[in-house]
Every structure is written in structure tokens, then in C-alpha cells.
Design a protein with these regions (language model features):
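Conserved MFS/SLC helix-loop-helix module at the cytosolic interface between two early adjacent transmembrane helices
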Residues: 74-113
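Helix-breaking motifs and short loop linkers at transmembrane-helix boundaries and internal kinks
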Residues: 55, 87, 108-114, 125, ...
Length: 431
């Protein structure tokens, strides 16, 4: 039996050396996800400065974020199906070109309305990242490695949130806030060159050895080609709804911290912009730990004989149970304790998310993964639109941050019940 750690022959039977190309492909997914989140967080890091220049209220800030979320929600539906139809290589390239152009145009805005428009355009493009990345993982990794691979590329969200703020603050001091958008947008075009030069499916890639291809295709029988399905057809399956409803409930928690943590630290905890720039990396470093650790744990349990569904749900249960503890950050008497508990929240969410994303490739064949991921992303975007953009703008204005932070502590536990009921033991379905 093949273990979770790849075993290669000393030499490739075809005469070449054993390759490890799937890890290079994964590094490109990590790079794209990092760029995706850099383009996304620039606005929230710079909002104290932009807010003063454009006189943006908390409610207007919520509406601007809502424009991103609404577009992201709609885009997810169509991007998933688009990527399943056109293929990962071209689909991913189209998505990153779109969002990089939209990110660059933020530099030309002069009013809240302009910002809202370009945030919406950014959301449409960025909605393609996760359907494409999840599909790439399904194409390049056997099932036992997919949660770990997902956790690794998903760590790009945290790396962006960790290294981005101090770099953005430094660029702000040197060149002003408009240049920050141009610099981060340019990274997408650099990635595009590397991607188009490198990405092909494993069985036709000239640099993949036979040993690596055999490993990638070790569960090929289970992943046999089936007819492509659209999102309307996918909605007939309760497993699709289990994934989508879990995304609806838990994605807003991450979005809330992404959007509102900088103004929370500024308005409530009294941080200045430089202090925010150094506090956020701590929060998202711990999110990296959760993402990678959460991806590694179910694979470890599977190698010890656990069924994959049981291993996946045990890991998700652990992270869901940590979220109410993390929500106590709203009541923390000191800023240090508050940052520690927020770090627990981001870490636990990312550990949860790495496993939730992987349920799509656990349960659905490869030809449906991007479509189902797109449906889930749409529901996650809808939840984010309501619970991290529109509602917080009102609640923060009239009641403060505390009710929101405490309430979000229980969203993952509710989602866990839905996952248990609708995804069950996470066995592969036949379309």
C-alpha cells in the first residue's frame, strides 16, 4: 500500500530522473493565492488614510466592501463552471489578468463610488482563484495529499496578510497610497508569465517522470473521467448543499477579520497605522500555522488507518470548538490578549477551511470540482456580503464591534452540524 509520503524509484523507468513537479505547480498556486490576497487587503490596510481623504463613513466602508462581496459572489458561480469548461491553465490566466487590471485601477479612484466600482471589478476576477486552485490540486495530487496541498496553497492568504501590511505601510510612507495598488497589481502579471510557461496536465507534461505520474494517478480508478456537469445539475446533490451552506456560515468570519480588524485596532484598541502594520503579521502567522497544520492532520490520521471522512470531520470538529474561545477577544482586558485570541480565531478558521475545501475533491469527481467549489464560493460570498460587509457597517456604527465578534464564535459549530448531516462519511458519489 502506498503511504501518504511519496515513494519514488531511484531512477525513472523511462530513463529520466524522478520528478517532483507537482510541488512546483503547488508553489505557483501559493504565489497566485498570495497575490490574490495582497490585492484584496491593500484597501483594508490603507482605509484609515483613504477614509480621511475621501471622508468615508463606517457605513460607506461597509457598502464598498459589499460591492466586492456581491461581485465575488456572482463571479464564483460562473468562474467555477468557466474553469471546468475551458480548463485550468487558461481559466486561471483569465482570472488573474482580470483582477490585476482591476486592482491597478484603484489607483485612479477619487470617490467612494469609484472605489465601490473597482472593488466590484476586483471581486469578479478574484472569484476565479479558488475554483482554479482546487481543481489544480485535484489534477496534480492523489486524494491522500490534497488537504495538505490545499492547506499549503491556502497559506498564501495568510502570508499576504502577514507580510503585506508592513510592506504596504512602508510603501505608503515612500510613495503614497495610490502607488501601493499599482505595485501589488504588477505581481499578478509576473505570475501570469510563470503560469503560462509551466502549467499543463500531468499526463501530457514533458517534465513529469513516470514515477511521479504513477503517484499522482494512484487513485485514478476512483477519479475516473465522468461527464462534466454544470452548477444547476450539481445542486441536485445534498453534498453540494452541505459544502455550500458551510461556506455561507464560515467564510464571513474570515472576511470580517480581513475587512474590520484594521479599523477595529485603530478605533477600539488605539493602534496607530504602524502598530497595525506589525500586529497583523502576528495574527496571520498563526493563521498559516492553522492552515498548514489543519491540512496535515487528516493525512496523518489516514496514514494511521482512519477512514478519510472520519479523519476530515475530526479535524474540522477540533477547529470549530476553538472558535467560541477565540471570540472572547471582544472582552479581552488587554490588547495583547485580544491579538492572541484573534490569532486563535484566524488559525482555527484556516485549519477548518483547508479541510472544507478538500471535501469537494473527496466527494465529487475531478470534472465537477471547480463547479461545486464555485457554488460554495458563491454561498460564502453571499454570507460575506451579509455578515462581513452590510450588517457590520450598521452594527459597528450603533452598537460597536463586540456583538459581532461574540456572535461569529458560533458560526463554525453550526456549520459542523450541517457538514455532518449532509456530507455524512464523505464517500465519493457517482454523477
Amino acid at each position: 500500500m502506498m503511504s501518504g509520503t511519496p515513494q519514488f524509484n531511484p531512477t525513472d523507468p523511462t530513463g529520466g530522473r524522478p520528478s517532483h513537479l507537482r510541488w512546483y505547480i503547488l508553489s505557483l498556486l501559493f504565489f497566485a493565492t498570495t497575490v490574490n490576497y495582497l490585492d484584496r487587503i491593500v484597501f483594508s490596510v490603507l482605509i484609515p488614510v483613504i477614509r480621511e481623504e475621501m471622508h468615508i463613513s463606517n457605513q460607506e466602508y461597509g457598502y464598498i466592501n459589499g460591492a466586492f462581496q456581491a461581485a465575488y459572489t456572482v463571479g464564483f458561480l460562473f468562474m467555477g463552471r468557466f474553469i471546468d469548461r475551458i480548463g485550468t491553465r487558461i481559466g486561471y490566466a483569465v482570472a488573474i489578468t482580470w483582477w490585476s487590471l482591476a486592482a491597478a485601477f484603484h489607483a485612479l479612484t477619487g470617490s467612494p463610488l469609484n472605489l465601490g466600482f473597482w472593488r466590484g471589478m476586483l471581486g469578479l476576477g478574484e472569484s476565479g482563484n479558488f475554483p482554479a486552485a482546487i481543481k489544480s490540486v485535484a489534477e496534480w495530487f492523489p486524494k491522500r495529499d490534497r488537504a495538505f496541498a490545499t492547506g499549503l496553497f491556502n497559506a498564501g492568504t495568510n502570508v499576504a496578510s502577514m507580510v503585506g501590511p508592513p510592506i504596504i505601510v512602508a510603501m505608503l510612507g515612500l510613495w503614497g497610497w495610490r502607488a501601493c495598488f499599482l505595485v501589488t497589481a504588477s505581481l499578478g502579471f509576473l505570475w501570469l508569465i510563470l503560469w503560462l510557461m509551466s502549467y499543463q496536465l500531468p499526463h501530457v507534461h514533458p517534465k513529469v517522470s513516470k514515477a511521479e505520474l504513477d503517484y499522482i494517478q494512484s487513485d485514478l480508478a476512483e477519479d475516473s473521467e465522468e461527464a462534466k456537469i454544470g452548477w444547476l445539475a450539481a445542486l441536485r446533490y445534498k453534498q453540494t448543499w452541505g459544502f455550500a451552506l458551510a461556506k455561507f456560515l464560515t467564510d464571513p468570519v474570515w472576511w470580517f477579520y480581513l475587512y474590520w480588524l484594521p479599523p477595529y485596532l485603530y478605533d477600539v484598541r488605539g493602534f496607530n497605522l504602524k502598530e497595525i502594520g506589525w500586529a497583523l503579521p502576528v495574527v496571520y502567522l498563526m493563521a498559516d500555522v492553522g492552515s498548514i497544520g489543519g491540512g496535515w492532520l487528516p493525512g496523518y490520521l489516514m496514514r494511521r488507518g482512519w477512514p478519510h471522512g472520519k479523519a476530515r470531520k475530526a479535524t474540522m470538529t477540533m477547529f470549530a470548538c476553538l472558535m467560541p474561545i477565540a471570540a472572547m477577544s471582544a472582552l479581552a482586558p488587554s490588547s495583547v490578549l485580544a491579538i492572541a485570541l484573534v490569532s486563535l480565531a484566524t488559525s482555527s478558521h484556516q485549519g477548518w477551511s483547508a479541510n472544507l475545501f478538500t471535501t469537494t475533491s473527496d466527494v465529487f469527481p475531478k470534472n465537477a470540482v471547480a463547479s461545486v467549489t464555485g457554488i460554495g464560493g458563491t454561498m460564502g460570498g453571499l454570507g460575506g456580503f451579509l455578515f462581513s460587509a452590510i450588517i457590520p457597517g450598521f452594527v459597528v456604527t450603533y452598537f460597536g464591534y463586540t456583538p459581532l465578534i461574540l456572535g461569529f464564535g458560533f458560526f463554525h459549530l453550526t456549520a459542523l452540524l450541517i457538514v455532518h448531516r449532509l456530507l455524512g462519511d464523505m464517500k465519493r458519489i457517482t454523477l
